[in-house]
Amino acid sequence: MNCVRMRLQCRLMPSSNTLARWCLESPQKNLTLHRPRISNVALRQASTSVSPKTRETEAEAKAKKLDQKRLDEHEEEVRAREQQVRRPWHREGADKPPVEGNADPIAKGKLLTTPTRLLKLILPLPLRVEKDQKNNGRNNEYGRSISLNSDIQPLALLIHPQQPLSYVERLIQAELPPVVENGQEKIPNVYFRAEDSEQGDQKPTSRAEARSKDDGGEPSEYNTNLSHVASYSGLGHRGPKRSSQDKRWVRWSSSTEMGDFIRDAARGREFAIEIEGYNIEMRVSVPSFGDRTYYMRQRLRKMSSEIDGLAKIKHECDLLAHRSAHRLAKGGFGLLAGWWGVVYYVTFHTEFGWDLVEPVTYLAGLTTIMGGYLWFLYINKDLSYKAAMNVTVSRRQHALYEMKGFDIERWEQLVQDANALRREIRVIAVEYDVDWDETRDVGEDVKDVLDEERSRRDDEHRSIEKEKDEKFTEDEKRKRKKDKESKETSGDS
């Protein structure tokens, strides 16, 4: 049925050439054109029947439009990235909070270490100061109202270990509203409290003491009273928990340095900051030795890896330089042996004899002595085998360093910085009473290299100081001699 209908529709739609021919052949008078009745389906098919060229142009236009749209989107994305690099505050979604969702409120403060020497103190202040328009005065200044923080926003402070507690106290006071006492406003005082040291651990410190304690005897006279000895652990917040009944708090003076206070507070897990007038006590966890030296040890490991690679190149160059110096020394001995052989042969196996060889040997020996004396006057140093070897080795070393691409200035700077970091970590280890095993962070080979370079630098420093002292004594002698001569000349006149 569909096929028959489609054939009828096709017959009802004659082509343009057939219609024109039919119009020309028919007479104009009796011409009566009747509009053919065409169904909607035939009209829709006629409208959709497009030539292949038209379809190609439409497809190309759509493709160009899509390509242009993609290019525009890419350009906008690149422009947005450049804008973010130039102005980070104009990034996408800058008006949205960085963290979505409700975070748990901080109930305990922390003392964190930073890559620098500063310490980051985070305090959960439960108070905040708001502007109150009701207390607005004539000066159009908003009054302050005190309210509790439902969501505590921690306060971050950067502190240097050598700054006193009074500095931290002033920083905290600047963030607090004044308290009213006897009708007058007063800045609240801030107190720092740390756990008191235990009254000695009563542990034996020697075999004799342990043996006497096992036998039921009294300990030695040097350890009869350990209540005046403070115990240190250095564990900080990683230490064992103790109940609040076992803790005894001691208030520290505001003139104490922050580093000393932290060192003493590290025996416990935390210290307390009390604010007068608000009955607020904030507990702050204390960093352990590992936390305090985390970034230092990380930098030391990074330096150690670089020092290890440079040390291998330096060791190879130094070994070649010493071999060259020893070859040169052996060559000098061979030259002297050859000279002895020539003198022996000319003296006993030729017709010239000792009469000719004797003055030649005298002149050659005297020339050698004069040349060595002139060289000693030129270098103005001790004439010794060690000094000559050092000069020869150092020249060969510098030549090999340049050949291998070894930067001696970079090496010295790395060694100096690494030794400074080691010294600083040792100081902190002494403060925390902790034995620091540096081979775990540095390595045995790098540790030996650093110790060797430090001893060499110390020897050079001592030799330089010795030369300065000798020069100073010589100058003083000359000055005294001149003063004595001037006094004698003035007395004679």
Curated annotation (Swiss-Prot):
Mitochondrial matrix face of the membrane: 46-326, 379-493
Record's subcellular location: Mitochondrion inner membrane
Membrane side Mitochondrial intermembrane: residue ranges: 349-355
Keyword Plastid applies: no
Biased amino acid composition, Basic and acidic residues: 53-98, 193-216
Keywords: Calcium, Calcium channel, Calcium transport, Coiled coil, Ion channel, Ion transport, Membrane, Metal-binding, Mitochondrion, Mitochondrion inner membrane, Transit peptide, Transmembrane, Transmembrane helix, Transport
Reactions the enzyme catalyzes: Ca(2+)(in) = Ca(2+)(out)
Transit peptide: 1-45
Positions of Ca(2+) binding: E358
Membrane topology: Multi-pass membrane protein
Transmembrane stretches, start-end: 327-348, 356-378
Superkingdom as given in the UniProt entry: Eukaryota
InterPro entries from the UniProt entry: MCU_C, MCU_fam
Coiled-coil regions listed in the entry: 64-84, 450-470
Residue span of region Disordered: 44-107, 193-225, 230-249, 447-493
Record keyword Transmembrane present: yes
Family according to the record: Belongs to the MCU (TC 1.A.77) family.
Record function comment: Highly selective calcium channel localized to the inner mitochondrial membrane, which mediates calcium uptake into the mitochondrial matrix. Mitochondrial calcium homeostasis plays key roles in cellular physiology and regulates ATP production, cytoplasmic calcium signals and activation of cell death pathways. Sufficient to operate as a pore-forming channel without the need of calcium-sensor or auxiliary subunit.
Domain notes: The selectivity filter, in which calcium ions are arranged in single file, is composed of two acidic rings separated by one helical turn along the central axis of the channel pore.
Quaternary structure and interacting proteins, as annotated: Homotetramer, assembles in a dimer or dimers configuration with two interfaces.
Name listed for the protein in its UniProt record: Calcium uniporter protein, mitochondrial
